[in-house]
Amino acid sequence: MSDVENASLPPAIFIMGPTASGKTALAMTLREYLPVELISVDSALIYKDMDIGTAKPSADELARAPHRLIDILDPTESYSAADFRRDALREMADITAAGRIPLLVGGTMLYFKALLEGLSPLPPADAAVRQRIEEQAKEIGWEAMHRQLSEIDPTAAIRIHPNDPQRLSRALEVFFISGNTLTELTKTSGDALPYQVHQFAIAPAMRELLHQRIEQRFHQMLAAGFETEARALFARHDLHTDMPSIRCVGYRQMWSYLSGEIDYDEMVYRGVCATRQLAKRQMTWLRGWDDVCWLDSENPTEALDKVIQVVSA
């Protein structure tokens, strides 16, 4: 698309970044300066009754700056990138029709990619192939399956954690069905996003600062009642670690603790480590992202001014 054609499209703003980088705070402050409406781009915030462990904005914050696509599903339900794209496009159209600017904020980079580039023509799921993969995983473990993916599709293996059997299984399944890797197929995108998108990524300049923030926030969640929240979910007896909701960082480790597999201190240690690993994967995505303006989360005023300057130009 030419610059002239792009300039004629309605504007949209992406605020992306790793967990605990200050994305939400920036987005909420921007609402005071620009005619924006917020859309959450977070695969954990979609779930009801999962508030503390997902660092969901508080009721007061949501009253001040409402977020769309938060609290839309029960934790038993799944939600794909295709589901997100459909819902986000609907919300963006609604916001644009009201004469305001969609501001999409979050850290689920797969959702941003699906929205920006469209969905790729991936083969449908094949139950027989998936069963063979799961049977092999039971024999050799998901770590070994991840090494297998590293040989087949190293790019996908970097982005998919060995402890994410759903995405790992899907990447292998795509290859076994089509003979093409997930990375190859996702280069063939569908419909591009019909908006002039201003893309920003926010993170501390030093990785150590992000690690400190992550550890501090995990302890704040625990102090705020994360264990009580997780116990209520655990007591439902209809949730388990094969579900995307319970695989969210923090909840998976809390589940192991509540199941008696690990003690409290180990749960805290693993929870912090898993969150740091998530942030590392998010940063890997962002470093390969095109046309993104980087913001320093340690200078929030400067970050705010930069976004306003770019969007208002």
UniProtKB/Swiss-Prot annotation:
E.C. numbers: 2.5.1.75
Domain of life: Bacteria
Gene Ontology biological process: tRNA modification
Stretches for region Interaction with substrate tRNA: 42-45, 166-170, 247-252
The keyword tRNA processing is assigned to this record: yes
Catalysed reactions, semicolon-separated: adenosine(37) in tRNA + dimethylallyl diphosphate = N(6)-dimethylallyladenosine(37) in tRNA + diphosphate
Gene3D superfamilies: 1.10.20.140, P-loop containing nucleotide triphosphate hydrolases
Site (Interaction with substrate tRNA): 108, 130
Pfam families the record matches: IPPT
Cofactor(s) for this UniProt protein: Mg(2+)
UniProt KW keywords: ATP-binding, Magnesium, Nucleotide-binding, Transferase, tRNA processing
Record-listed ATP binding positions: 17-24
Residues engaged in binding substrate: 19-24
GO molecular function: ATP binding; tRNA dimethylallyltransferase activity
Enzyme class: transferase
Stated family: Belongs to the IPP transferase family.
Assembly description: Monomer.
Role, per record: Catalyzes the transfer of a dimethylallyl group onto the adenine at position 37 in tRNAs that read codons beginning with uridine, leading to the formation of N6-(dimethylallyl)adenosine (i(6)A).
Protein name: tRNA dimethylallyltransferase
Taxonomic source organism: Pectobacterium atrosepticum (strain SCRI 1043 / ATCC BAA-672) (Erwinia carotovora subsp. atroseptica)
